[in-house]
Amino acid sequence: MTIKISIDCMGGDHGPSVTIPAAISFVESEPDAELILVGLEETLLAELKKHKASEHPRLSIVNATEVVTMDDPLEIALRRKKDSSMRVAINLVKQGNADACVSAGNTGALMAISRYVLKTLPGVNRPAICSILPNQKDGPTYMLDLGANVDCEPQHLHQFALMGSALVSAMEGNPRPTVGLLNVGEEDIKGNEVVKQTAVLLRADHELGRLNFYGNVEGNDIFKGTTDIVVCDGFVGNVTLKASEGLGRFVKSVLTTEFKSSPLNMLGALIARGALKAISQRMNPSRYNGGSLLGLRGLVFKSHGGADAYGYQWAIKRAFDAAKYDVLTRISTKIADLMPQSAATPEDSAGAIPNATIEP
């Protein structure tokens, strides 16, 4: 079965210099993948020729005459740049010509255009960006929101928990994934009013058997693997994500410096080379690149804007796997079961522009 993924090749900090090599590497490693490269045709063709892949049978180009920059206001990206590579790539999903879309572009624009073109699933007020982080249990911790919604009300965090539960059930085959609410302490009295009110909603769902709510969790619980899912607003989630990425690079830098500081340390590094390589791979942020815009009527994945080709390839893989295992249908069914009485409010309608302005 061939899976078609549309790639917004112009998005991100590096554009085609990263997206094209990533696309080539992925399609060569995955025989069931077909990638649709969207962007300025001449630019994409030149990059493909540079990598001797202009005649690849599973790489095609769809021309788009405009580019959404990282600085474009939402209004311009959504209303004026109607032939942007981002919008064309998303439209391919809407039209059924692609099974999923990947972009490293402007987060706010990607969310706004995705909501406008694809609409949200029934019962979903706001989509959220969900991705995985590593934990001590050698498994994934799913975390949302990672930057789509800076300001949230309790009902939004409540829905994020339900959507995250649906995603993990579909991806991991776990019918009762545990949900933790990120807070400054485990006690019920801790946190701001939004978090406290969210906890009340989640406990009510837990008592009804609709959700497996663990309770409040702290930042260290993310990497301990205390719960399968960690829920927070997009501001907190994005800061947490960036801090963890920075810590990983810091630890790697310190280890490299120390092991090179003396002949004895260099010998120790040589002896521990296998273990150090494994640690480096587990802590490499690029391996966890690619967040799902959860809650849309189509599969859209957000790559980190500054990702290199290796990291972008992981984002493509996550989109490919989601399409391959029909995650959208499974999530839609699960959400319908979990949120039978939920309805979008007017201000959160599918075509509204969300308050997503930060870059995950």
Swiss-Prot record:
A GO cellular component annotation in the UniProt record: cytoplasm
Keyword entries, A-Z: Cytoplasm, Lipid biosynthesis, Lipid metabolism, Phospholipid biosynthesis, Phospholipid metabolism, Transferase
Pfam entry (one): FA_synthesis
Signal peptide feature range: none
Major location category of this protein: cytoplasm
Catalytic activity: a fatty acyl-[ACP] + phosphate = an acyl phosphate + holo-[ACP]
The organism's place on the tree of life at top rank: Bacteria
SUPFAM superfamilies membership: Isocitrate/Isopropylmalate dehydrogenase-like
Subunit structure and binding partners: Homodimer. Probably interacts with PlsY.
Protein name: Phosphate acyltransferase
